[in-house]
Each structure stands twice: as structure tokens, then as C-alpha cells.
């Protein structure tokens, strides 16, 4: 598989400087699994110069490919669940923060007519703390948007990778149909000896059939 066919893979080029350690770890693991799966596909396309050799490589790499798909699925699911949890937590914190802010404002307005100079100074400190909390919330929302963007990019990666796997399987099925046609012609060559031709064709067909349908 050439480099031009991997233009969709972000790999280590994504910017995660503002991301959480958990997200960085998850993305690194996802990149590693993606690289391994691409390596398996490359091995089939580069070394499978014949139908038999390609069938053998597919058979040997099938367990590894299934294992990588399972790990990729778990990483993708974990990332989606984490994203959903952050969305809900952010929404709850925002509602709680707004409710608390309204209560504080009402309290400050009521106390303003009766407060002394000392109480007025305390009120100023509370307003400063409120502004600091609002800035913190903005930073958290910005980080969440970044993580959501990266999540969408990784989702596209998984979709394109599965599309490539389907393409490889389709090509393999097409080669099998061509092979069946040539096997039939081979049997016809032994038509002068019906018994011998039948025995040889049956043995060869059984051998190739077991290889092809063991996937």
C-alpha cells in the first residue's frame, strides 16, 4: 500500500499539547494499532504475488488482524464514553455554576444597601473569584472542543480503515472466482481418463477449498 493511500492517517502529526494525559495515551495506542493493521494489509498486497501465497498470508495473519480490530474497537468505545462523560459533567457544572452565581448576585444586591465599607471590600473579592471561575470554565470547554475534534478525526480514520479491509476481501473473492474457472479447465484436460481426472481434480479442489474457506 503506497504512502499516497495513507493520506487520511494523522499519526503523530496531530496537536495534543492541550490535551489530557488520558487522551494522549489513548491516541498513541490508537496510532500504534492503526500502524500494525496497515502493516498487515501491506504484507498481503506486497508479498502476495500469487493466489496461493496470498491465501497463506491471509490465513496466517487473520488471528492478528482480528485481535487488532478488537483492541481498536475497545479504544474507540472508551474514547466515545469518556467524551460523553465530559459533556455531561461540563453541562452539570455549568448549570450549578449559573445557579450559584444568581444566588450570589441576589445576596450581594440585598447586602449592598446595609453593608459597611468592610463588607463592600469582601463583595469585591467575591466578584474577582467569580471571574476566575468563569475563565477556568472557558479553558475546560476549549480543551473539550479540542478532544471532540480529535475524536471525530479518529472516527474517520477507523471508517476508512474498515473500507480498505472490505476492498481487500472483495479482491480476494474475485480472484477465487477466476481460480475456480481455471480449475474447471484443468479437469477437462483429463477427460480422456475420466477416473484419473476425477480423482486428481477432486483432491486438488478439496485442498484449495479448505484454504480459501478457512477465513
Swiss-Prot record:
Q: Which Pfam families match?
A: KIP1
Presence of keyword Transcription regulation? no
The molecular function terms in GO held by this entry are: actin binding
Ranges for the NAB domain? Answer: 5-90
On the tree of life, the source organism's domain of life is Eukaryota
Coiled-coil features, chain-numbered ranges: 134-165
Q: How does it assemble?
A: Interacts with F-actin.
The free-text function statement in the UniProt record for this protein reads:
Plant-specific actin binding protein. May be part of a membrane-cytoskeletal adapter complex.
Listed name of the protein: Protein NETWORKED 3B
What species is given as this protein's source? Answer: Arabidopsis thaliana (Mouse-ear cress)
Amino acid at each position: 500500500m503506497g504512502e499516497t493511500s495513507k493520506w487520511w492517517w494523522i499519526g503523530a502529526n496531530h496537536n495534543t499539547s492541550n490535551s489530557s494525559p488520558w487522551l494522549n495515551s489513548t491516541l498513541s495506542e490508537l496510532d500504534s494499532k492503526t500502524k500494525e493493521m496497515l502493516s498487515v494489509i501491506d504484507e498481503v498486497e506486497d508479498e502476495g504475488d500469487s493466489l496461493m501465497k496470498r491465501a497463506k498470508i491471509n490465513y496466517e495473519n487473520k488471528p492478528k488482524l482480528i485481535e487488532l480490530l478488537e483492541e481498536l474497537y475497545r479504544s474507540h468505545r472508551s474514547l466515545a464514553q469518556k467524551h460523553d462523560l465530559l459533556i455531561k459533567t461540563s453541562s452539570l457544572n455549568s448549570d450549578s455554576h449559573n445557579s450559584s452565581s444568581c444566588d450570589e448576585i441576589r445576596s450581594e444586591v440585598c447586602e449592598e444597601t446595609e453593608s459597611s465599607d468592610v463588607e463592600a471590600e469582601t463583595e469585591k473579592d467575591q466578584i474577582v473569584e467569580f471571574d476566575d471561575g468563569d475563565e477556568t470554565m472557558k479553558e475546560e470547554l476549549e480543551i473539550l472542543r479540542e478532544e471532540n475534534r480529535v475524536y471525530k478525526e479518529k472516527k474517520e480514520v477507523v471508517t476508512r480503515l474498515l473500507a480498505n479491509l472490505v476492498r481487500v476481501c472483495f479482491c480476494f473473492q474475485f480472484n477465487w472466482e477466476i481460480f475456480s474457472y481455471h480449475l474447471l479447465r484443468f479437469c477437462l484436460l483429463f477427460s480422456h481418463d475420466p477416473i484419473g481426472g476425477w480423482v486428481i481434480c477432486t483432491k486438488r479442489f478439496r485442498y484449495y477449498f479448505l484454504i480459501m474457506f478457512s477465513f
